[in-house]
Amino acid sequence: MRNWRWLLLVLAVLLAWLQYRFWFGPGNSGEVMMLEAQVAHQTQDNEGLRQRNQALAAEVKDLKDGEAAIEERARSELGMIKPGETFYRVVEDAPLPAPASPETAAPAQQAPASTDPVDHP
């Protein structure tokens, strides 16, 4: 009977020590949850960067292999045209200012109030 008590005491101390390490020791459950959240965030960032890299790789491949992409960039960014083409630029007139109505023009014609900081009786 006495051996059972010692065994039970040793097991209780061992359980208490393991629980302490689980909750408060190095690599505790809170730290593990924080690291899992960081891993999830980093995975999300990596996926975005992977998609960006794929788009850039496709653009590089298109620029190396195809003339259509180079021609499109030359036309849109540099304003270039092919020989024999005529370039037309359409410039719209600036909108005319709206005429001032008599109500809005009247306050502007009034004399400004005195700017003298001293009050006169």
From Swiss-Prot:
Location of region: Disordered: 94-121
Q: Where are the Cytoplasmic topological domains?
A: 1-6
Disulphide bonds annotated for this chain are none
Provide the topology term for how it sits in the membrane: Single-pass type II membrane protein
Q: Where is the composition biased (Low complexity)?
A: 101-121
Encoding gene (name): ftsB
UniProt keywords (A-Z) are:
Cell cycle, Cell division, Cell inner membrane, Cell membrane, Coiled coil, Membrane, Transmembrane, Transmembrane helix
Q: How does it assemble?
A: Part of a complex composed of FtsB, FtsL and FtsQ.
Q: Where are the transmembrane segments?
A: 7-24
The Gene Ontology biological process terms listed for this entry are: FtsZ-dependent cytokinesis
What does it do? Answer: Essential cell division protein. May link together the upstream cell division proteins, which are predominantly cytoplasmic, with the downstream cell division proteins, which are predominantly periplasmic.
Protein name as it appears in the record:
Cell division protein FtsB
**What does UniProt give as GO cellular component?**
cell division site; cell septum; plasma membrane
What family classification does the UniProt entry report for this protein?
A: Belongs to the FtsB family.
Coiled-coil regions listed in the entry: 31-66
Q: According to its UniProt record, where is this protein located?
A: Cell inner membrane
Q: Which residues lie on this side of the membrane: Periplasmic?
A: 25-121
InterPro entries xref list: Cell_div_FtsB (IPR023081), FtsL/DivIC (IPR007060)
Look up and give the organism this protein is from: Xanthomonas oryzae pv. oryzae (strain KACC10331 / KXO85)
